[in-house]
Amino acid sequence: MKQLNSEQLQNIIGGNRWTNAYSAALGCAVPGVKYGKKLGGVWGAVIGGVGGAAVCGLAGYVRKG
């Protein structure tokens, strides 16, 4: 089995702690619901909340640093 060296480990994207993704998702879901409700009623709120959580949750997962 081949082992990774430290330079190869720097190229891995993602893998941050789950709390980073979770807090980022919650931080974007709330404004997504708020603005989505204004634009599209109940379904706008659902789409805005889920979309905001997905985008920011992914960003929190893959963010380096």
UniProtKB/Swiss-Prot annotation:
Keywords per UniProt: Antibiotic, Antimicrobial, Bacteriocin, Host cell membrane, Host membrane, Membrane, Secreted, Transmembrane, Transmembrane helix
GO cellular component: extracellular region; host cell plasma membrane; membrane
Bilayer-crossing regions: 39-59
Prosegment residue ranges: 1-15
Subunit field text: Active lactobin is composed of two different peptides, one which is lactobin A.
InterPro entries membership: Bacteriocin_IIb_lactacin-rel (IPR019493), Bacteriocin_signal_seq (IPR010133)
Known role: This heat stable bacteriocin inhibits the growth of closely related Lactobacillus species. It may act as a pore-forming protein, creating a channel in the cell membrane. It kills Lactobacillus helveticus ATCC 15009, but displays no activity towards Listeria species.
Gene Ontology BP annotations: defense response to bacterium; killing of cells of another organism
Main location: secreted
Family to which the UniProt record says this protein belongs: Belongs to the bacteriocin class IIB family.
Signal peptide feature range: none
Compartment(s) where it occurs, according to its Swiss-Prot or TrEMBL record: Secreted; Host cell membrane
Pfam family, one: Bacteriocin_IIc
Protein name per the record: Bacteriocin amylovorin-L
Keyword Signal: no
Membrane topology designation: Single-pass membrane protein
